[in-house]
């Protein structure tokens, strides 16, 4: 699935209007119908609902939704904030104001000057339709005060498209008291880039994406740097069967350089994961102290003893290996850095750096210059910051891995709730299949193994 910037989303709307053709007000009605259906599945007609609509198209969505809710027996209290200079509304917002007025609904109030907020209780619902993703500046004045009031009310808050005050992409100066904190965000067609950043979760709450049937040709032809990988995408690309006359050598020979004294568990987990996920042969290069552990715990693996008793001192370079993975439990000292430097200058096979191999890069940045094209780095956020310095938020980290991937012609897999994969062509692919249960020791060793198993077997 493509993820578009705010600017590109405006283009999608405009081209859908042109290609279908459909009027902008009818496209807004389509969005309101999707919103109304989801709200009715979430909120009871007996629940008190307050709708706060801004002067732009986000407000138009809110007013159209209010009208459709009234048609379904709901009794929302609706406030339209027409407080911009010259009291100008967007054309579609103005048209939906007139449609709502014609219903004769008594609890519709247009605010043009001072506003005394209603008493909103914790059992009520607030529908936030003040500002959408097109907002360009942080909220100030009366709108900032209204946002604080909404957040302090304890009500169940539903934001239309995006919480008011939150920008669609980067939020470098996000202030908690100027952004609505929604419990549920109902967005359109595809998620906003901002939804993938951990620092914004407290604003978006649960997110649901509503299909408003933007023109498929428009989506297909509009370029983007951002993509979302779903479980369905992964399932379509998994090799489900093997030829009857298969040989283990058909599925790659992986060299795993991992482990040190007292840290062999990482090597065991990685080797087992590689074998379970389909690689034909696995050789584990570890210090000599690992012999009994590996031969017992992973009998299918070939043990490749290092000359070091307790630490890896060198990593073999041999054409028999179809891919090499380095780092789990390996340790990070001068000998490790030296072994990696020798390897990256000689190797031609696909290479994956994880864990302590990444920490070696943090110690010796020049390693990056010698990495073979399309080497895969698999840091979590702390490993990333050890390598490239402190970063305050996920948005900064995303920019960092994009820069690193394009500069060094490598792939960076930033592990997290929405794992971000930066490719050398500048694109970012988010993986939506993770879950909090993976936040445990060893899961990174297994996850990285799945990456290099793919490299070894292809």
Model-derived features: positions:
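Phosphate/ribose-phosphate-bearing ligand recognition and processing surfaces
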Residues: 57-60, 86, 135, 164, ...
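Nucleotide and nucleotide-moiety/phosphate-recognizing core
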Residues: 36-125, 129, 138-160
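Positively charged, low-complexity/disordered segments
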Residues: 456-458
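Small-residue (G/A/S/T)-rich helix-start motifs and N-terminal tracts that mark the onset
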Residues: 1-82, 90, 94, 184, ...
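Internal gly/pro-rich beta-alpha loop/helix module
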Residues: 130-221
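Alpha-helix C-terminal capping/helix-to-coil transition sites in glycosyltransferase folds
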Residues: 121-122, 181, 320
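Glycine-rich phosphate-binding loop
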Residues: 125-139, 324-331
């Amino acid at each position: 699935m493509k993820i578009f910037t705010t600017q590109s989303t405006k283009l999608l709307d405009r081209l859908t209007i042109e290609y279908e053709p459909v009027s902008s007000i009818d496209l807004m009605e389509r969005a309101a119908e999707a919103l109304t259906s989801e709200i009715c599945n979430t909120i009871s007609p007996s629940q008190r609902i307050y709708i706060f609509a801004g002067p732009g198209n986000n407000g138009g969505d809110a007013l159209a939704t209010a009208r459709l809710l009234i048609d379904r027996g709901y009794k929302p209290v609706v406030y339209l904030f027409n407080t911009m200079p010259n009291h100008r509304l967007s054309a579609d917002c103005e048209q939906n104001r007139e449609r709502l007025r014609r219903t004769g609904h008594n609890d519709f109030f247009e605010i043009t000057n001072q506003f005394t907020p209603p008493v909103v209780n914790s059992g009520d619902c607030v529908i936030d339709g003040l500002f959408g993703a097109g907002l360009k500046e942080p909220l100030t004045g009366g709108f900032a005060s209204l946002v604080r009031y909404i957040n302090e009310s304890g009500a169940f808050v539903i934001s239309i498209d995006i919480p008011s005050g939150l920008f669609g992409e980067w939020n470098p100066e996000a202030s908690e008291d100027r952004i609505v904190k929604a419990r549920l965000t109902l967005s359109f067609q595809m998620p906003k880039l901002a939804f993938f950043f951990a620092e914004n979760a407290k604003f978006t709450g649960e997110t649901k994406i509503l299909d408003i049937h933007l023109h498929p040709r428009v989506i297909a032809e509009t370029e983007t740097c951002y993509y979302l990988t779903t479980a369905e995408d992964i399932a379509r690309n998994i090799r489900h069967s093997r030829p009857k006359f298969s040989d283990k050598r058909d599925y790659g020979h992986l060299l795993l350089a991992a482990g040190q004294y007292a840290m062999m568990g990482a090597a065991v987990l990685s080797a087992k994961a590689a074998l379970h996920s389909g690689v034909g042969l696995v050789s584990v290069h570890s210090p000599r102290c690992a012999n009994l552990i590996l031969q017992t715990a992973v009998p299918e693996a070939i043990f490749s003893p290092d000359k070091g008793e307790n630490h890896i001192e060198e990593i073999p370079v041999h054409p028999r290996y179809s891919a090499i993975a380095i780092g789990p439990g390996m340790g990070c000292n001068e000998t490790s850095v030296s072994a990696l430097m020798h390897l990256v200058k000689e190797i031609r096979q696909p290479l994956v750096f994880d864990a302590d191999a990444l920490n070696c890069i943090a110690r010796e940045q020049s390693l990056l210059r010698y990495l073979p094209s399309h080497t895969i780095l698999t840091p979590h956020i702390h490993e990333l910051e050890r390598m490239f310095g402190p970063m305050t938020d996920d948005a900064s980290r995303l920019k960092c891995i994009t820069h690193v991937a394009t500069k060094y012609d490598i792939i960076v897999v930033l592990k997290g709730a929405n794992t971000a994969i930066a490719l050398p062509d500048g694109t970012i692919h988010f993986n939506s299949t993770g879950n909090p249960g993976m936040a445990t020791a060893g899961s990174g060793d297994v996850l990285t193994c799945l990456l290099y198993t793919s490299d070894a077997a292809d």
